[in-house]
Structures are given as structure tokens and as C-alpha cells.
């Protein structure tokens, strides 16, 4: 959970409470806690808002968020080589888009 760990780290470094960031996102604190723990995925627009509020590069935050989505898609696959091969194929397809 790259994104959740990053927002928790930044929040703690900046001395912010979960409820403060939850209010900024207009969600309740338990929902924010789930996002931070990786139990729930933030929406793309929430990632952008968090990047702004935490004074972080939006592209970096979106990259972590999207990487988590990829990891979630393959985490139950037992054959890691198959996962790596699928990522390479997807990467090549993305380049051609």
C-alpha cells in the first residue's frame, strides 16, 4: 500500500490529524482512516486534493495511487513471473496508446 503509507507519513510529518484531512476531502474520519490503511481506495480527485494540501507533487501521488491499483489487481496471483510478464505486456500496450 504505497499511497496509504505515503499520506500517513506526510500527515504525521506535518502534524496533521486524520480528521483534518478528512474534512478537507469532505469525507468522514473513518473513511479517511480506511484510505490511509489501504482498506479503501481514494478517488482520483481526492488524490489530487491531498497532493495540494500536503504540498506534494501531484504526479508522484497519482503514480503511487495507480501503482496500488496495479498491485491490487495481481496480488492474489501465485505465479510472480506471470505477473511480471503481464506488467511488461501492459506497459508495451500503454506506450502504444
What is the role of each PLM region?
Residues 5-24, 49, 77, 82-84:
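Short basic helix-loop element that most often maps to the first helix and adjoining turn
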Residues 1, 12-13, 41:
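Short amphipathic helical patch at the helix-1/turn junction of helix-turn-helix
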Residues 7, 21-22, 32-35, 61:
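Conserved hydrophobic/aromatic packing and binding residues within compact polymer-binding modules
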Residues 62-97:
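Short, charged recognition helix plus adjacent turn
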Amino acid at each position: 500500500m504505497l499511497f496509504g503509507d505515503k499520506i500517513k507519513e506526510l500527515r504525521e510529518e506535518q502534524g496533521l490529524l486524520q480528521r483534518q484531512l478528512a474534512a478537507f476531502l469532505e469525507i468522514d474520519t473513518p473513511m479517511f482512516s480506511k484510505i490511509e490503511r489501504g482498506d479503501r481506495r481514494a478517488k482520483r480527485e481526492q488524490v489530487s486534493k491531498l497532493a495540494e494540501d500536503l504540498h506534494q507533487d501531484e504526479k508522484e501521488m497519482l503514480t503511487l495511487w495507480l501503482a496500488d491499483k496495479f498491485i491490487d489487481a495481481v496480488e492474489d496471483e501465485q505465479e510472480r513471473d506471470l505477473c511480471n510478464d503481464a506488467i511488461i505486456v501492459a506497459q508495451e500496450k500503454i506506450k502504444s496508446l
